[in-house]
Every structure is written in C-alpha cells, then in structure tokens.
Amino acid sequence: MAQQDVKPTRSELINLKKKIKLSESGHKLLKMKRDGLILEFFKILNEARNVRTELDAAFAKSTEKINLASAVNGMVAVRSTAFTAKESPEIQLSGHNIMGVVVPKISSTGVRKSLYERGYGIIGTNSYIDETADAYEDLVEKIITAAELETTMKRLLDEIEKTKRRVNALEFKVIPELIDTMKYIRFMLEEMERENTFRLKRVKARMRD
C-alpha cells in the first residue's frame, strides 16, 4: 500500500487498524495450518517409507518366484497361465480431506484371487505357479498403497509450499506495509493537529490585538 495514495484521516486510520488485526489473525491461522500440514506430511512420509521397503521386498520376491516357476515350467507355460484369469482387478478412486486438502483414496477389488478365480485350475500346474501368483498379487496391492501415499505426500507438499508463501507474504510484506502506513497516517494527523493548534493561537493573538 503506497503511503501517498492514502488519505490521512481518522476513518482511514480506523480501517487500517481493522486490516492489521484481520491480517494478523489470518497469519496466525495460516501458520497453524502450515504446521498441521507438516505434521501430517511427516506422518505419511514414515508410513510411505515402510510401504516402499515392503514394496521393494515384494518386487524381489515376485521376481524370484517367477524365475523359479519359469525354470520349472518354462516361460511360455507361465505366460499362458497368466492369461487364464477370469476377471481383471478393478481400481476405485475417491478422495478424502486432510486439513482442507483433497487427497486420493485408492481401493481395489479382485487383486487377491482364489484358484478358481485365477482360472488355470489345479491340473497341469504346480505350487510354483501358485506361489508366483500369490507374490504378484501381493506386489500389486503394495503398488496401489504406495501410489496412494506418494500422491498424498505430493499434494500435501504443494499445499505446504502454497501456505508458506502466504504466511511469508503476510509476515514480511502485507502486515509491515500496513503498520508503516498506519504510522504515516498518525504522523500526518499529529502534524495537522499541530498546525491547527498553531493557527488557532495566531487567530486568538490577532483577536487580542
């Protein structure tokens, strides 16, 4: 707010005081929101790290199982078995709110399957195929969980940065400028009052003369 654009009046001084009070209140609320978002972010970050560790282990296990199944049954047989599934997994996307930020909720159906649902039956296959299917179903579930957590972290981080910018703008620009303008108006009002007092004294002096 440029000081030269402000009229040095008492009503303007009152308006400025209200703006400062409102800005300070908004600044306090935004700081609380920022701190709350940071706490939520680190809570989810810890969970995401655990899931990422589980995901890496699940990937290593599924790779080991498919290599073993391929060595015993042949890669062609393993691939053929994979295409016999009667139904594909379904992913459902929804959202939920964390301190004003809408983050994804990813749920799935049909990832875990029974032998019947897998479609390849028992005859002509062995436990290596079953263990490979189990391992990859577990891997898919871990991928879904990791995707939800990592997307949530990204959205929270974006909101944290946005809130930090607003906090800093209020703290280092808006509020200081309002306070400086208020001081300027007070100074101008005091000067005007001194001038008026001086004029009044001169008028009284002339009247006495």
UniProtKB/Swiss-Prot annotation:
The keyword Repeat does not apply. It is found in: Cell membrane. One of its GO terms (molecular function) is proton-transporting ATPase activity, rotational mechanism. It is a peripheral membrane protein. It comes from the Archaea. Its main location: membrane. It holds the Pfam family ATP-synt_D. Gene3D superfamilies: 1.10.287.3240. GO terms for cellular component: plasma membrane. Keywords: ATP synthesis, Cell membrane, Hydrogen ion transport, Ion transport, Membrane, Transport. Optimum pH is 5.2 for ATP hydrolysis. The keyword Transport applies. One of its GO terms (biological process) is proton motive force-driven plasma membrane ATP synthesis. This organism has both a Na(+)-translocating F1F0 ATP synthase and this H(+)-translocating A1A0 ATP synthase. Belongs to the V-ATPase D subunit family. Has multiple subunits, A(3), B(3), C, D, E, F, G, I and K(x); there may be a few other subunits as well. NCBIfam families: PRK00373.1-1, PRK00373.1-4, V_ATPase_subD. Component of the A-type ATP synthase that produces ATP from ADP in the presence of a proton gradient across the membrane. This is A-type ATP synthase subunit D. It comes from Methanosarcina mazei (strain ATCC BAA-159 / DSM 3647 / Goe1 / Go1 / JCM 11833 / OCM 88). The gene is atpD.
